[in-house]
């Protein structure tokens, strides 16, 4: 597993890897849109890309292509708000990406819905993320602190597996897994293991990384423990042909 010490290393080396080692794939769908036969949506793809990010001193390289940190911060607030918001307000800061996916004023799903769904923990009602925080407080060694995003939607009584045909959008994120473990110095820290089925490198990866890191910091703070590392697995990490020129552009140049 590749270990990155900062977001600049992550973004610059991953861009190069996709360009040099990505294999071409011609997908038929993008979210809930049909793109079959559209040349600009041919992808370069890396399968089961895995890495560990150990520090987030400067997040700006994560937004080098999107300039979307304001959206990411607003989106994060909605995700931990305790309210199952749909569509919320954060999407308005990135209308160019999200507006086309509104259906009768709502999205097919939101992370705020999936993360704040009410569940029962030891006989009491909590949001899904709230239950995980309570579990981590009482059992530092647990392997059950999994915040699933993909799967059943208790709010709409839906199941993502019903929409494999593309009728609705389904989450690119599978789950976040929180593990409290000792680091090399013998200090307990809360790590986050983030598994995605799919991530668009140019349009979404930087946001995905930032939001996962913020989530780790938030849960660590609520539990009262030091935040640790992000372990990230992406089954299909890809870039669309319309964005390939950005893979060959120096990120340092883009940051200036």
Walk through the language-model features, giving the residues of each.
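Terminal, non-catalytic protein-protein interaction segments that mediate quaternary/complex assembly
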Residues: 1-256
């Amino acid at each position: 597993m590749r270990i990155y010490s900062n977001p600049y290393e992550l973004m610059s080396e991953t861009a190069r890897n996709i360009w040099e080692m990505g294999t071409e794939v011609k997908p038929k769908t993008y979210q809930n849109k049909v793109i079959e036969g559209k040349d600009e949506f041919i992808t370069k793809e890396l399968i089961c890309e895995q890495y560990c990010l150990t520090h987030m001193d400067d997040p700006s390289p994560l937004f080098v292509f999107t300039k979307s940190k304001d959206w990411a911060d607003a989106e994060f607030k909605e995700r931990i708000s305790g309210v199952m918001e749909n569509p919320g307000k954060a999407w308005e800061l990135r209308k160019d990406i999200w507006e086309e996916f509104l259906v009768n004023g709502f999205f097919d799903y939101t992370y705020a819905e999936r993360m704040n769904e009410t569940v029962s923990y030891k006989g009491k009602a909590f949001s899904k993320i709230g239950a995980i925080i309570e579990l981590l407080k009482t059992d530092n060694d647990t392997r059950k602190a999994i915040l699933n995003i993909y799967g059943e939607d208790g709010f709409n009584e839906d199941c993502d597996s019903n929409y494999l045909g593309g009728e609705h959008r389904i989450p690119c994120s599978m789950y976040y897994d929180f593990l409290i473990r000792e680091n090399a110095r013998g200090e307990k820290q809360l790590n986050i293991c983030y598994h995605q089925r799919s991530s668009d490198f140019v349009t979404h990866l930087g946001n995905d990384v930032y939001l996962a890191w913020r989530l780790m910091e938030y849960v660590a703070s609520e539990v009262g423990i030091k935040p640790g590392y992000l372990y990230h697995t992406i089954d299909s990490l890809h870039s669309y042909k319309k964005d390939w020129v950005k893979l060959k552009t120096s990120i340092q140049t883009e940051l200036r």
